[in-house]
């Protein structure tokens, strides 16, 4: 599966970066307020008309002759832009997203690694 972040696709590198799993289709939580009112058996629910940001986790496989340089390039691609950027997937879904926390790299072989990326995102409607 292909994806792009900040208008650059995962297929535009000199190394191979393949998205193997993503939870981007998980629905965001509705934003509401629950207010306890004395004498009432249940809470008053106020719908704020919004959805909360969600966390998207993508797992990719990286294949490169030099994992260190490839990881630096991935970091620069995902973490250099300041603020929210467009994250889109080949199924047509699109989000305003920012990388949340570390980009986790787990080396599998000398030339292969598993990359885990977490984004804080809200859906573009």
Whereabouts are the PLM-identified features?
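Extracellular/virion structural assembly segments
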Residues: 1-125
């Amino acid at each position: 599966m292909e994806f792009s972040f900040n208008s650059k696709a995962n297929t535009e590198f000199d190394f191979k970066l393949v998205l193997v799993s993503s939870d981007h289709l998980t629905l965001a939580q509705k934003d509401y307020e629950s207010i306890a009112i004395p004498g009432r058996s249940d809470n008053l629910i106020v719908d704020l008309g919004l959805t909360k940001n969600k966390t998207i986790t993508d797992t990719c496989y990286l294949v490169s002759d030099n994992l260190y340089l490839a990881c630096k390039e991935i970091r620069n691609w995902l973490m250099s832009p300041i603020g929210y950027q467009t994250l889109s997937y080949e199924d047509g879904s699109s989000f305003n997203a920012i990388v949340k926390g570390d980009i986790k790299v787990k080396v599998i072989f000398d030339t292969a690694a598993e990359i885990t990326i977490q984004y804080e995102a809200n859906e573009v409607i």
